[in-house]
Amino acid sequence: MDMRTTEQQYNPYRVFTRQQWAELRNDTPMTLEPGEFSKLRSMHDRLDLKEVEDIYLPLSRLLSMYVDAAQRLYYAQRQFLGIRDRKMPYIIGVAGSVSVGKSTTARVLQALLARWSPRPKVDLITTDGFLYPNAVLERQGLMQKKGFPESYDLPRLLAFLSDIKAGRHTVRAPVYSHLTYDIVPNQWVEIDQPDILIVEGVNVLQTGPLPRDGKAVPVVSDFFDFSVYIDADEAVLRKWYVKRFLSLRDTAFHDPRSYFNRYALLSDEEAIATAIAIWERTNLANLEDNILPTRPRATLILKKGADHEVETVALRRL
């Protein structure tokens, strides 16, 4: 038996080359201006006109179909039950490793989706705001595992998503500072009944152990209607992380308020060694143990090459 044929037969995804995916754009119009790309792009990530045209416009077209189908199903169920619920936002999860470009993808999707007709309200949050404060992580011995599932205030995040999905007004999310590397006290992002909410974070597709008593144990992805996993080989991710660390050493780390200010005067050799040590101790371990195993749970997988361009797209079969 041809093992490749068998693998393709049972693969839950349809896999597209970049060219095949780009052809699915159809007549979806470009609604972004060239000057917006630099504002949407994260440090050292790549975003240009061709990337938006080839990858994100087809994805925008697909998402418009998914959202429309979800709305029609919602109204059909409401009619069947004879009830009048509040509208339920469509929630999109964006997952992937540190330094893979999740934030760029999330911001591009927000910009494109907000320009659909008739101009839906599209909000974006990151799960960084639901990390425990550093004081709590220090007390629990988890500072070296910041970003691991156990470093998040999961009950608070689940309550937030439950309130959003229930259509409640003015749901608040904590604010996280990448400068101070900590939760900002008494600051909040307010989300007020969006049509679409994008939730970005490394572990948003994470599952928990199944309870033996059969009781329901919710996970973050239970609230998602669609999910995107941004993928890249580990060697590529490591290279991007080191490059980003070197850039931050020359910029943000010089701010006295920066949690990483102590790295600002490192030589290139010292900075590279430090970045690799952090990558291997924390980010690689998190990737291998927690993030990468969730990739098969995504609706769509964008696989990037070393130049930051998406090379293949995998869409889960219905």
Curated annotation (Swiss-Prot):
Q: List the disulfide bonds.
A: none
Which reaction is catalysed here?
A: (R)-pantothenate + ATP = (R)-4'-phosphopantothenate + ADP + H(+)
The residues listed in the UniProt record as binding ATP, with positions renumbered to this chain, are G96, S97, V98, S99, V100, G101, K102, S103
Q: What class of enzyme is it?
A: transferase
Q: What is its EC number?
A: 2.7.1.33
**Pfam families in the record:** PRK (PF00485)
Could you confirm whether the keyword Nucleotide-binding appears in this record? yes
Q: Which UniProt keywords apply?
A: ATP-binding, Coenzyme A biosynthesis, Cytoplasm, Kinase, Nucleotide-binding, Transferase
Q: Where in the cell is it found?
A: Cytoplasm
Biological process (GO) annotations?
coenzyme A biosynthetic process
Q: Which PANTHER family match?
A: URIDINE KINASE
Record-given protein name: Pantothenate kinase
